[in-house]
């Protein structure tokens, strides 16, 4: 039985899908105006792992993750680079795909873009106006927060808290609102900015309405799981809930999931603070699987500190698992012990996708594998577990010269010519091949 920590209820809940055997899942994707940083990547990796585990447990997952390709940040970047907003979005979508592929992330079932849904967004806003949940003001359209039942329930805030925080605002936009806490559904455009025609004049959608429309248009009014980083609880996901439920009268999502931050020196990694490392740069010195494995060392909801030591530890541990996977697996299977490991792994992951505990079971299994010689079914079980974390080992093929040297060493040992055997062993070490003689035969690892 899979249990999920639901941000809305703030407790572990048994997962019950809307439709047996199927899951509808929407995860907020990047605003494509720059390379993603390691903190952004954690969210992508965390929900990819969750999706993979659902599939491991037999579910068919419709996994949607959007590209926000209409945003003020994209407009500003276009001015800086002297290109169009569309060209900015295309450039960084391509960069995102390249980065997450290196991290072993599966493509979403669909990656919708805001520009594909402009007509749907306008209809959605019109509907909210007709229902009295939204109003036009000088070409902008705002959502009436006070009309929303239990607004900000996801963030555990009250409307009174928000109104108190907004008191005293005197900026131009606030003057156009009925209430300072109302948020934009549609923004009128300034001269020269990218815009779309609408009943309220040329403009572009607000950030929050984009995800509501893409989710409901593709997956329907109510989905199983909505996910994203912890910083999206408020205001983004809060506003998604308000506008979606105002339109449909139904629960927007049955489970809300949020991943923790990546910290540097215990401070959240963010572009606004300037303390970030892009995945594009990190991959110049790190293997993508190492970074991916680093994320798996901590529960997805908890913050994780990005340090050189932590990353190097992940690299060492991943190498150990790779060497384990490359054993010959020519022996017999201990079916009961293998099943015990599978059961322990499922128990760990069923408890809110606890990757850290799941990885602990994988290492226990690796230790067991290295203590004997088992058959290919054990190797497959190890591969299946690792694949959930996006770790896929490609077995290295020794070139003919090295294979010949290993065979000659075996013959020398059989003839008790240990001097020659040792010379060959030392020669292989210089080529990065380390041999291990066991009761079940010779094994090798690549340093």
Swiss-Prot record:
Stated name of the protein: Cysteine--tRNA ligase
Residue numbers binding Zn(2+): 28, 211, 236, 240
Keywords: Aminoacyl-tRNA synthetase, ATP-binding, Cytoplasm, Ligase, Metal-binding, Nucleotide-binding, Protein biosynthesis, Zinc
Residue span of motif 'HIGH' region: 30-40
GO MF, one example: cysteine-tRNA ligase activity
Similarity comment text for this entry: Belongs to the class-I aminoacyl-tRNA synthetase family.
GO cellular-component term (any): cytoplasm
Cofactor: record remark: Binds 1 zinc ion per subunit.
InterPro entries: Cys-tRNA-ligase (IPR015803), Cys-tRNA-synt_Ia_DALR (IPR015273), Cys-tRNA/MSH_ligase (IPR024909), CysS_C (IPR056411), Rossmann-like_a/b/a_fold (IPR014729), tRNA-synt_1_cat_dom (IPR032678), tRNAsynth_Ia_anticodon-bd (IPR009080), UVR_dom (IPR001943)
Swiss-Prot/TrEMBL catalytic activity: tRNA(Cys) + L-cysteine + ATP = L-cysteinyl-tRNA(Cys) + AMP + diphosphate
Broad class of where this protein is predominantly found: cytoplasm
Short sequence motif named 'KMSKS' region, residue ranges: 268-272
EC number of the protein: 6.1.1.16
């Amino acid at each position: 039985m899979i249990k999920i920590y639901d941000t809305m209820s703030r407790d572990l809940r048994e997962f019950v899908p809307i439709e047996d055997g199927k899951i509808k899942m929407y995860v907020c994707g990047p605003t494509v105006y720059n390379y993603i940083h390691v903190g952004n990547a954690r969210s992508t990796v965390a929900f990819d792992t969750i999706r993979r585990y659902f599939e491991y447990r037999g579910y068919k997952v419709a996994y949607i993750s959007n590209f926000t390709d209409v945003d003020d940040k994209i407009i500003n970047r276009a001015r800086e680079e002297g290109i169009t907003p569309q060209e900015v979005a295309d450039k960084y979508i391509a960069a995102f795909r390249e980065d997450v592929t290196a991290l072993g992330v599966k493509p979403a079932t669909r990656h919708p873009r805001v520009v594909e849904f402009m007509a749907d967004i306008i209809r959605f806003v019109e509907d909210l106006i007709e229902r009295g949940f939204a109003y036009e003001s000088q070409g902008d359209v705002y959502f009436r927060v006070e009309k929303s039942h239990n607004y900000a329930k996801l963030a555990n805030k009250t409307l009174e808290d928000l109104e108190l925080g907004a008191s005293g605002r005197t900026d131009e936009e606030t003057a156009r609102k009925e209430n300072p806490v109302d948020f934009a559904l549609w923004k009128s455009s300034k001269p020269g900015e990218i815009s779309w025609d609408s009943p309220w004049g040329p403009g572009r959608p607000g950030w929050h309405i984009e995800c509501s429309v893409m989710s409901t248009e593709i997956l329907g009014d109510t989905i199983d799981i909505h996910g994203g980083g912890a910083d999206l609880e408020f205001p983004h996901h809060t506003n998604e809930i308000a506008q979606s439920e105002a339109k449909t009268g139904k629960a927007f999502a049955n489970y809300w999931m949020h991943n923790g931050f990546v910290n540097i020196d215990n401070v959240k990694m963010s572009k606004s603070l300037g303390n970030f490392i892009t995945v594009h740069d990190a991959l110049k010195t790190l293997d993508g699987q190492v970074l991916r494995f680093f994320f798996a060392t901590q529960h997805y909801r908890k913050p994780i500190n990005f340090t050189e030591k932590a990353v190097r530890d992940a690299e060492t541990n991943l190498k150990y698992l790779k060497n384990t996977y490359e054993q010959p697996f020519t022996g017999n299977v201990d079916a009961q012990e293998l099943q015990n490991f599978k059961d322990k792994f499922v128990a760990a992951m069923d408890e809110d996708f606890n990757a850290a505990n799941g990885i602990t079971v994988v290492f226990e299994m690796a230790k067991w594998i290295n203590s004997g010689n088992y058959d290919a079914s054990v190797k497959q079980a190890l591969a299946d577990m690792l694949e959930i974390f996006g770790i896929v080992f490609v077995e290295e093929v020794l070139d003919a010269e090295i294979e010949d040297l290993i065979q000659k060493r075996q013959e020398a040992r059989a003839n008790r010519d240990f001097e020659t055997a040792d010379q060959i062993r030392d020669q292989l070490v210089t080529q990065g091949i380390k041999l291990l003689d066991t009761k079940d035969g010779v094994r090798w690892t690549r340093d």
